[in-house]
Structures are given as structure tokens and as C-alpha cells.
Amino acid sequence: MASLQALRGTRDILPPETQVWQWIEQTAREILGRAAVQEVRTPIFEQTALFERGIGEATDVVGKEMYSFRDRGDRSLTLRPEGTAGTVRAYIEHGLASQGGVQRLRYTGPMFRYERPQAGRQRQFHQLGLELLGTADARADAEAIALATQILQALGLKNLRLDLNSVGDACDRAAYRQALVDYLTPYAADLDPDSRDRLERNPLRILDSKDERTQAIVAEAPSLHDYLSERSRQLFEQVQQLLTHLGIDYRLEPKLVRGLDYYTHTAFEIISSDLGAQATVCGGGRYDGLVSQLGGPETPAVGWAMGLERLVLLLQQGQAVPPATLDFYLVSRGAIAEGQALILAQKLRSAGFGVELDLSGSAFGKQFKRADRSGAIACLVLGDAEAEQGQVNLKWLQSGEQQTLDQSELLQDSDHWRSRLQAARTVSPVEVAPL
């Protein structure tokens, strides 16, 4: 019988790599929380029509990449390929617009697209997203970008570049679309196959083709900026001014278009020069028409999503990641000691300490080796002799220093031991398995 393994394009995330994921998520949660952003959790699968209407039937995501199926009720369902459409559906369904003000929402979770697996791109991948719904103010665009850069900086990531563009409103894009088609049509035979297919369905996507021959043709194409309305120009200028005031560097990239049809006005990507072909770690922009397009009230909005796999890849390249908070590794040997060790572990955890209890029942030597590999700051050693005296041996794993103390001393003077543990704690890189 063939062995059962994870499907191509999916992967298991195991310790210690999970520590990296938790650190990314915790960092984002803290930063966004300070900006009054609240979490929303939406279903992993939705009606297929949600993505067809929201993302756009002419997009590659809808046309080629979605995992769609029919359930036993003969309903067409799809595993979510991105997070914004589901968040907007929830915003409409639960009447969040009627609460007034700006809804500041975030999400984290798995997404699904049928793509060729490669480093930083899986068929099941994870995104962290931010959505600010209910404001057309340029400050929202700047704040969204500022929060994204703050998260990436807090993770210690370097060699990042912010690319910025405006894709205008629907009227701007319609005029530009025709001009682009008129320009590209004489070159149709010279375009790569994907771009030839997009020429009729979604010509703006040709602008970010990776084919060198197509890029050379596109380099001389009309500029979208020449087709922006006065209002679109003013909004884009305001966003640029605000980013400058915030001290956020950016590069204007007139060929930048996002792969989803709902974007309007501001579009941006944060690019890492330390990644290969999959260099975008965060992408987003404004989507003023999506809420009404999905049946809700006219609602301007802006948001972004980060690819967690790509952040992990960057952190794998040498960035130090805080280890899991494990204070003590508790080893025991003997009938009395083993029972008492369980009680001591629970009491220490209740006092706020991180404790791993060795449950192997093996000799002390083997337990000590596991303690050395555990990442704990100190090892607590309990034999029957110590248990009968209500004592425990403490060994600081980094220095090798040892001492014997009463168990009650650990519990009653917890602040002292917490400060000792903190002083001994060091930040060390966590091994991350290749993606």
C-alpha cells in the first residue's frame, strides 16, 4: 500500500518552525491591535459566485487557479483564493456598515490556488490581511501602508522596496484599457501566449508580464497616469505626500497593476530583493467599488495582504527569532519524585512559568540530553531524595551553575526567579525547514 503523504503544493509546518509563524502572527497582532484593528474569521469555503463577482471572471485566479467543487446539494463552492472577498461578504451580511465610522479588520489563515509549487508559492498558502472599510480619505491608504511597513520592520526585515501606483477609477481604466489594446494589437503575434490570451480578456495584466519580449513591447506602451482624472491625480498626490511626511520611501511604478479586478486608485507592493521570482511580500490597494459590487452600500475601502510563507523564507535567511518561552525543563526519576514532579509542574505553570515535564521515565542521563535540546533556560531535577525533603535541584543550562532549593521558594518568590530567567534568556536563531 502506498504511503500517505501531504499533497503536492501543501506542506506540514512543524516545530521549531512553528515558532517563527507564531512570532510573525504575534508581532502583527500587537502592532495592528495598537491601531484598533480587530480580527475577523471567515469560512475557508464560500459560494463560487462570491469570487467570480468580486475578483473578476477574467482574472487568472478565477479562470485558472480556484479550487471549486459541487457539494451534495449541487451548490458550487470554492476554497477561498484570497481573504478580501470573504471579509467584504461578512461586512455586508452582518450590517457592519450601519455601525458607522471605519471598520478596521484583520484576518489570518490559509488560502488555496492551483499554481505550480515553488519556493514561496504553494497551493495552500497563508495570508495575513488588513482591511479598512468605510473611508475614502487618503490618510487611510497611508495608514495601511505604514502599518504594513511597521510590521515588516518589527520583524527585522531589510532590503525591502515599496512600489506605488494609481490604477485610477473605473472610467480612467476603461479609457486606458482601450488605448492599451490599440497599442498592443499590432504586436499580438509577438506577445507571449498568456499575454495574447489577456489582450481581449484582461489587457492591464499584460503590464506585469515576466516575459522579456513582452516587457520590451510594454515598455513603450501608453502610461496609465496620462488617463487619470483630476480627482484620481489629487488622491494619488495626497497619498504620496502623506507617505513622505511619514518618512516612508517609495518608488513610483507606473506599470504596477494588481492581479485582482477590484482595485481602484492606490495600488502598492512591498518587494524583497532577498527573494527570487516570488519577491512580493505584501500587496494591496484601494477597492472602492467592491462592497457595492457584492450587494452592499457604496463603501470606499483599502487593504493589503502579506504572504506568510515568504516572510518565513526571509526570516530563514539569518534573522534571529525569539525562541519559545520555556523556562524550565523538569526531569524526575523514582516513584515519589515522578508523582511530585507532575504537581510541581502544574503549580509552576499556574504561577506563570513555562515548564516542560519529561514523561519518558528514562534514566537521568537521557532526560538531561533532552533538557539541553529543549531550549529551556534551566533544568529542574527531582529524585526521590529531593522529593521527600520538598526540595529540587536547579541547573542553569547555559552556565552549568547548580543549586538546591526548597520547592516552595520557587513558588513563593516567583518574581525573583522570573527576573533571573529573563536575565539568562538570549535570542537565538530558530532552524526553519526549507519551503
Swiss-Prot record:
Principal place of residence: cytoplasm
Q: Name one GO biological process term.
A: histidyl-tRNA aminoacylation
EC number(s) in its UniProt entry? 6.1.1.21
Q: Is Cytoplasm among this UniProt entry's keywords?
A: yes
Q: Which InterPro entries match?
A: aa-tRNA-synth_II (IPR006195), aa-tRNA-synth_II/BPL/LPL (IPR045864), Anticodon-bd (IPR004154), Anticodon-bd_dom_sf (IPR036621), His-tRNA-ligase (IPR015807), HisRS-like_core (IPR041715), HisRS/HisZ (IPR004516), HisRS_anticodon (IPR033656)
Where does the record say this protein resides? Cytoplasm
Provide the catalytic activity annotation: tRNA(His) + L-histidine + ATP = L-histidyl-tRNA(His) + AMP + diphosphate + H(+)
Q: Name one GO cellular component term.
A: cytoplasm
Q: How does it assemble?
A: Homodimer.
Protein name (database record) = Histidine--tRNA ligase
Encoding gene per record: hisS
